């Protein structure tokens, strides 16, 4: 058992603050304090524990009165220089030159939050200082160019050219408004709260953003960015007294308390539901039929009622999210929508419960509402499935106790959950960190009719509802673009010759401003660590290769809080290209169809009662020593408490060996759902999808990934769904034969993350699992993939592009070195950032260099296409002229080390172990790479120009983007085709 060290505040010495409350936050092994700064009125919550991954944020309540996106533009622009740190982009300087474990800023419908995290004390203090100066003393009052660059501006490079609009936030929101799910979410929020801040789009509506003036934008900052409207949060193992003294002396003591009217207002309940319908744009190739979204939305109490909120998280599972959940099943059985989504969202003062039917038809709206309400009435009368409720509670409780938030520091997630109550009650930051007792209470209420009463009161008898539909319209984006062109042409026509000349001059001036680097003396003001502050040792690989009951096992022997992270990895390296997409289907089938002993709904409940989740993944591990050699694995991952291991293994064998792939109706439902979810991911992650596709033209690894999770998988799924009746028998036979071939002892590798006790338990309990697993045949020779350069342009109903270029440097005779890790930082946050984002207006730009030689450059929500590709082609010249001084090199090195040293939770440490084993990389090689990073000189970067030239010479290009923009540049592609 671990002991938790907590440093107590010296409150007597902190005379600038008054203590509002202190609490033992035993659920998260911490002590919580709520303070108020006496002079400024700032609110501060502290969570003190022994977590070295320290977190700070400052947030502001930022309600809006229109959809110009002013809080979003401020979020971008305050990080573009300040009094103490006048460089043009301190945010990027920190990304490149700090050991941050998190660094970002986020705009919500009612708040704006600026969080940072770091494990290094000195670095953490630097990050705090830069962020505090940014929000309180930004350069936005001195330089209107910042507003124009990040928000919006008219652009006219030549007096005879048409006027256009550009700006990072403007283009980001054009991308956001291209997604039907994004459109629906906005309309739902607006529909339920028409008299509050939520009736507007805080991120900005692209049609409205250009109405925002520079003065209105500054007024918003003046009004809301005052300490008395702020929420300051500190978390982790640090000297809290020192941080509070710093806050007071450097910032808060300079302000006097004022009144800021920012209270988030409650929406008065409706007397009857409202019905709203809006259009969304689809590509000309897409069908109008089965393409509407229908939604049923209800406002549920307030976020200050933690038991109600957690009860609705459980109801979300029991009614809607779980496989076979009654609301979802009733709609699917009635043929309304092919994918049922929705759920419970408590990110606003009044949370929302939604049921959404995707791939539906507008004429079914009345039937949709009727089925939901009839089903709910029946549930209230007959009672909910008790096991579903208990499984829902167990699932939420497991997640809270485990506190595994992937790459996000848990202190950040705790801090954001503080805001779920604190923003609406200044005295209540810790409400959602004290919930284990609530879970206990909810378990006790399962048999009392409590959950059925909630359904009656909040879903059936509650008239605060909206029925929102969004309907497909072909060419809507093109129509809106044409209207904008006409509006801009009329605007230009209204200008005098002098005004046109001034606009050309302003455009030129902004470009000059963007191209001018920050003065050296300003850059020197950004605090930075030194090379010698970097730890020289690479993170150790803490695994051992052992035999568990005769099965090769990679055991990562670390403390895991009594949880087995068990990964059963079956080799699929010999599965053919034709068969691989069917593994993508199998992944969605296992655990979601009936088995010998359970129907699929009961199986889901059993999984959530006995484990922290069981899921399938398909991964490929490229061998770092042999080109085009790899290990492909079908992975069944589980999280099982030590005391539940026997039950967990029983469920794993039930899923792998006893799934009955015979239910045609259920199989079709699963196919339709995969198709729907893939559509969403192809659109929302267009940058990574297009990069993967570009690499698939030459890379076996990327070709594999595309077949099991990219555009190639989508095409197979769409074909199967469309011709299901004639293909269903073939599909069921194929899935069964693949399962029989793969799930055998001779293909199995185990990855276990747990301590010695956990390993011994597995050794003891695993023989029973092995008795049902046939020996089978060992995998055959790995498949040789047929890669073919296609250079595709995919047409989408988007307003922006995702532009990807790729190649392989190993095939051109170059090798992987630590310098490539630094190059990724330099390109992503210098060359590409300045050219693609700052000047080009794209929301994002990235690059990547894999050990197997695959390399890519990609853009995200990019208004451009051809010019972005030309920017990629300029990289070699940029590198040949690269001449960083020692400070700049150190900065790039720190940013690289920051990425290499991201703190890992137990599950991630286990994945790192097995990945190193399968990719054939040793600790010595990791150490050599780290040395190459820490000792890098400018010459090492300059020398990469030839490597990049070789990558670009392979000319692998893939773009996903707006129909008219891709068509306009069709000569760049070998093929232009519809994405869907």
PLM feature spans:
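Hydrophobic, small-residue-rich alpha-helical packing segments that form membrane-like cores
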Residues: 158-227, 233-251, 255-282, 290
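Non-catalytic, conformational "gating/processing" segments within enzyme and secreted inhibitor domains
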Residues: 218-250, 731-766
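Extended, domain-scale alpha-helical bundle/helix-rich regions
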Residues: 447-486
């Amino acid at each position: 058992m671990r002991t938790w060290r907590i440093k107590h505040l010296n409150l007597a010495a902190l005379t600038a603050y008054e203590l509002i409350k202190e609490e033992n936050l035993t659920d998260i092994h911490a002590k919580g304090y709520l303070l108020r700064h006496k002079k400024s009125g700032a609110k501060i919550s502290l969570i003190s524990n022994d977590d070295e991954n320290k977190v700070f944020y400052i947030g502001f309540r930022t309600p809006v009165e229109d959809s110009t996106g002013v809080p979003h533009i401020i979020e971008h622009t305050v990080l573009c220089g300040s009094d103490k740190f006048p460089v043009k982009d301190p945010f990027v300087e920190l990304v490149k030159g700090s050991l941050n474990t998190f660094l970002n800023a986020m705009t919500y419908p009612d708040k704006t939050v600026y969080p940072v995290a770091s494990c290094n004390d000195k670095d953490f203090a630097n990050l705090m200082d830069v962020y505090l100066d940014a929000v309180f003393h930004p350069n936005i009052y001195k330089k209107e160019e910042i507003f124009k660059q990040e928000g919006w501006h008219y652009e006219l490079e030549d007096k005879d050219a048409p006027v256009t609009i550009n700006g990072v936030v403007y283009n980001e929101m054009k991308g956001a408004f291209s997604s039907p799910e994004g459109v629906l979410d906005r309309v739902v929020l607006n529909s339920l709260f028409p008299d509050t801040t939520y009736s507007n789009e805080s991120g900005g509506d692209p049609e409205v953003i250009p109405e925002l003036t520079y003065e209105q934008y500054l007024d918003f900052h003046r009004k809301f960015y005052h300490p008395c409207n702020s929420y300051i949060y500190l978390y982790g193992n640090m000297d809290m007294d020192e941080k509070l003294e710093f806050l007071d002396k450097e910032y808060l003591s300079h302000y006097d308390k004022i009144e800021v009217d920012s209270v988030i207002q409650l929406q008065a309940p409706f007397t009857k539901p409202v019905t709203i319908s809006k259009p969304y744009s689809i590509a000309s190739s897409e069908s109008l039929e089965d393409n509407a979204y229908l939604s049923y939305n209800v406002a549920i109490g307030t976020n200050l009622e933690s038991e109600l909120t957690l009860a609705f998280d459980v109801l979300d599972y029991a009614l809607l999210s779980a496989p076979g959940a009654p609301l979802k099943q009733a709609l699917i059985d009635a043929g309304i929508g092919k994918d049922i989504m929705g759920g419970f969202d408590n990110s606003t003062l009044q949370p929302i419960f939604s049921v959404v039917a995707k791939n539906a038809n507008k004429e079914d709206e009345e039937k949709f509402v009727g089925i939901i309400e009839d089903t709910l009435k029946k549930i209230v009368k007959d009672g909910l499935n008790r096991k579903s409720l208990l499984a829902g509670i167990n699932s939420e409780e497991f997640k809270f106790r485990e506190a595994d938030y992937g790459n996000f520091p848990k202190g950040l997630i705790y801090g954001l959950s503080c805001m779920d109550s604190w923003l609406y009650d200044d005295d209540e930051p810790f409400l959602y960190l004290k919930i284990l007792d609530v879970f206990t209470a909810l378990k006790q209420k399962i048999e009392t009719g409590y959950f059925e009463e909630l359904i009656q009161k909040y879903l059936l008898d509650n008239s605060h509802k909206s029925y929102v539909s969004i309907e497909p319209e072909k060419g809507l984006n093109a129509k809106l673009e044409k209207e904008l062109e006409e509006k801009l042409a009329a605007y230009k026509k209204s200008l005098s010759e002098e005004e046109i000349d001034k606009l050309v001059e302003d455009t030129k001036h902004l470009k000059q401003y963007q191209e001018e680097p920050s003065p050296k003396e300003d850059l020197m003001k950004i605090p930075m660590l030194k090379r010698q502050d970097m730890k020289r040792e690479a993170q150790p690989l803490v695994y051992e290769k052992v035999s568990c009951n005769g099965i090769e096992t990679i055991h990562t022997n670390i403390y895991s809080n009594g949880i087995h992270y068990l990964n059963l990895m079956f080799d699929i390296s010999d599965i053919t290209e034709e068969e691989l997409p069917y593994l993508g289907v199998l992944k969605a089938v296992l655990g979601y169809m009936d088995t010998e002993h359970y129907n699929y709904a009961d199986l889901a409940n059993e999984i959530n009662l006995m484990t922290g989740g069981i899921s399938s993944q398909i991964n490929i591990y490229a061998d770092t020593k042999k080109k085009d050699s790899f290990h492909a694995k079908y992975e069944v991952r589980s999280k099982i408490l030590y005391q539940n291991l026997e039950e967990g293994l029983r469920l794993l064998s039930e899923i792998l060996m006893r799934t009955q792939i015979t239910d045609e109706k259920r199989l079709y439902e699963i196919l339709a759902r995969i198709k729907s979810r893939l559509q969403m991911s192809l659109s929302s992650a267009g940058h990574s999808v297009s990069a993967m596709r570009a690499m698939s033209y030459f890379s076996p690894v990327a070709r594999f990934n595309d077949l099991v999770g990219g555009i190639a998988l989508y095409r197979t799924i769409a074909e199967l769904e469309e011709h299901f009746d004639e293909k269903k028998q073939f599909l069921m036979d194929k899935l069964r034969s693949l399962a029989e071939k793969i799930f055998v002892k001779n293909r199995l590798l185990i990855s276990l993350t747990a301590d010695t006790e956990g390993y011994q338990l597995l050794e003891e309990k695993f023989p029973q699992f092995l008795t049902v697993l046939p020996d089978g045949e060992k995998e055959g020779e790995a498949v040789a993939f047929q890669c073919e350069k296609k250079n595709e342009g995919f047409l989408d109903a988007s307003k922006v592009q995702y532009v990807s270029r790729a190649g392989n440097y190993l095939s051109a005779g170059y090798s992987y070195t630590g310098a490539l890790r630094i190059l990724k930082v330099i390109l992503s946050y210098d060359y590409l950032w300045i050219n693609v984002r700052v000047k080009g207006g794209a929301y994002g730009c990235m690059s990547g260099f894999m050990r197997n030689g695959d390399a890519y450059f990609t853009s995200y929500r990019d208004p451009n296409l051809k010019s972005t590709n030309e920017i990629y082609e300029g990289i070699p010249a940029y590198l040949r002229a690269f001449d960083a001084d020692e400070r700049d090199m150190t900065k790039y090195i720190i940013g690289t080390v920051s990425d290499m040293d991201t703190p890992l939770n137990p599950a991630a440490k286990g994945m790192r172990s097995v990945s190193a084993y399968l990719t054939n990389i040793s600790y010595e090689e990791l150490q050599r790479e780290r040395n190459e990073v820490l000792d890098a000189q400018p010459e090492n970067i300059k020398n990469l120009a030839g490597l990049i030239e070789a990558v670009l010479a392979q000319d692998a290009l893939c773009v996903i983007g707006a129909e008219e923009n891709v068509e306009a540049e069709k000569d760049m592609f070998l093929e232009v085709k519809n994405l869907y």
